[in-house]
């Protein structure tokens, strides 16, 4: 992790790390899981542990001690961010999914292929946004699609 942070800082780029998300992995995912606090501990010599205001992004940003940038940590399991998440995901097969950790998708592909109007498409997008949860869960639902099938 430190090497990637140094590389990004040398180019004035932002690097973001995401916790392993247990999609279709079964119980062994915990062997590879690294929570945010452990990521911060591994980067303690490079990153100020005081979070910056991240707004509505899933990432929480931390300033580099050398002043040459920031590091983002996306922590859906150890530090859920559902209340401030502004993301939707368009799946590989044409569905709009409001939350990776909840069932429920809105089909866009069929509407687009049928020549739906801009207003009809906007209504479908609003429907998906309305399906975003205010609070999250630490695991995707049983039988959840893999990230490959979701388009991630």
Can you annotate each of these PLM segments?
Residues 1-72, 110:
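Radical SAM enzyme [4Fe-4S]-AdoMet core and its adjacent flexible, acidic
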């Amino acid at each position: 992790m430190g090497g990637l942070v140094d590389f990004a800082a040398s180019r004035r780029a932002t690097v973001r790390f995401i916790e392993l998300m247990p999609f279709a992995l079964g119980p062994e995912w915990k062997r590879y899981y690294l929570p945010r606090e452990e990521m911060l501990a591994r980067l303690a010599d490079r990153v100020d542990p005081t979070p910056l205001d991240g707004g509505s992004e899933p990432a929480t940003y931390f300033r580099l001690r050398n002043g040459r940038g920031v590091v983002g940590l996306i922590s859906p399991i150890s530090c859920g961010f559902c209340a401030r998440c502004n993301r939707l995901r368009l799946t590989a097969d044409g569905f709009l999914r409001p939350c990776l950790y909840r069932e429920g998708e809105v089909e866009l592909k069929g509407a687009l292929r049928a020549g739906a109007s801009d207003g009809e498409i906007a209504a479908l997008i609003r429907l998906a946004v309305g399906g975003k949860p205010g609070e999250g869960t630490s695991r995707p639902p049983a039988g959840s699609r893999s990230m490959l099938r979701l388009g991630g």
